[in-house]
Design a protein with these regions (language model features):
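C-terminal helical/coil "lid" or tail adjacent to the Rossmann-like core of SAM-dependent
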Residues: 184-204, 224
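Conserved S-adenosyl-L-methionine
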Residues: 169-181, 198-206
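Conserved N-terminal segment of class I S-adenosyl-L-methionine
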Residues: 1-97, 101-105, 115-118, 178-179, ...
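A short glycine-rich, Lys/Arg-flanked "PGG" loop and its adjoining helix->strand segment in the class I
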Residues: 115-130
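A conserved mid-domain beta-alpha-beta active-site/ligand-binding segment of alpha/beta enzyme cores
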Residues: 197-201, 209-210, 214-218
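Short, glycine-/aromatic-enriched active-site segment of Class I SAM-dependent methyltransferases
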Residues: 132-154
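A short His-aromatic
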Residues: 106-110
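Short alpha-helix
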Residues: 153-168
Length: 280
């Protein structure tokens, strides 16, 4: 099932994509900070992330710039501890020091008012609150690929992004995220987070390679001492085991439909060549 959202910029339930794994993994990280807290999910989109965090948060607000999106989110997610409101990153409709945690995933690259956004988020965040934000690293996401995302107004290089957050928050923890399609073999009896060995290759040669560059940077920031959950000290993997199988099945289905359609129409093409003169 594909989303009704063809741009891929906003994840919706029903999406089957790399973005699905990336976004859900980020929300799983955020969940570690939200237990019994007041939480803000800024640029919440259709609200799936707000809903996920609501299962752990005391209260949660989802804010989005698009009014119709907010209306639909209210209808779709109606838990007692959830509310949705219209607003943007420079004008959040809540009083000062409202939230224990603010989450903002893949938002800052969609505009150029970066200082205004962080200033506004800091306003609604409690003095000892935690801010969790992510954005693609321009070098890996754009420069290395040679392709620009037309929906991104101002991407940041990793150092620029980290420096921006550090101007507003005294304590930060930096995480890197990379989508990987591959096979993961681990030692079942190991109790430590041992260094990983990465391999790459083909049918002719398999060899050790460097760890992939993180495509996205996630920063956890606070002006209070950061208490990092034990699980965050470990590397984590989001597994969608049927991801490739589902895509393969979908494309096979499309291919079969094409072949059947071609077979049905082929006799008509032959007759057309016989009976229809050129120019008719």
């Amino acid at each position: 099932m594909f989303s009704k959202n063809p741009t891929g910029e906003r994840l919706e339930q029903g999406d089957l994509s790399q973005g699905m794994a990336e976004h859900l993994h980020r929300y799983k990280i955020a969940e570690m900070f939200c237990s019994d807290k007041s939480v803000l999910d800024i640029a919440c989109g259709e609200g799936y992330g707000t809903n996920l965090l609501s299962k752990f948060a005391k209260t949660i607000a989802g804010v989005d710039i698009d009014n119709q999106t907010v209306v639909e989110a209210k209808l779709k997610y109606s838990a007692e501890n959830i509310q949705f409101a219209q607003g943007d990153t420079s004008n959040i409709p809540f009083p000062d020091s409202t939230f224990d945690v603010v989450v903002s995933f893949e938002t800052i690259e969609h505009h150029d008012k970066h200082d205004e956004m962080i200033t506004e988020i800091k306003r609604v965040l409690k003095p000892d609150g935690v801010f969790i934000i992510s954005t693609p690293d321009k070098y890996v996401y754009t420069d290395l690929k040679g392709v620009k995302n037309k929906f991104h107004v101002k991407e940041l290089y990793k150092k620029e992004f980290i420096d921006l957050i550090k101007r507003f928050f005294s304590n930060t923890t930096i995480l890197n995220q990379k989508f990987i399609t591959g096979s993961y073999i681990y030692n079942e009896s190991s109790t430590t987070n041992s260094p990983k060995i990465w391999y790459s290759g083909n049918f002719n040669k398999v060899e050790q390679t460097a760890r992939p560059e993180g495509e996205y940077t996630i920063v956890i920031a606070s002006n209070a001492a950061l208490t990092i959950p034990p699980d965050l000290e470990k590397e984590s993997f989001f597994i969608e085991s049927n991801f490739i199988d589902k895509l393969t099945a979908q494309f096979k289905s499309l291919s079969i439909r094409y072949k059947v359609g071609y077979a049905v129409l082929s006799p008509l093409r032959i007759l057309k060549k016989i009976f229809v003169k050129p120019g008719k």
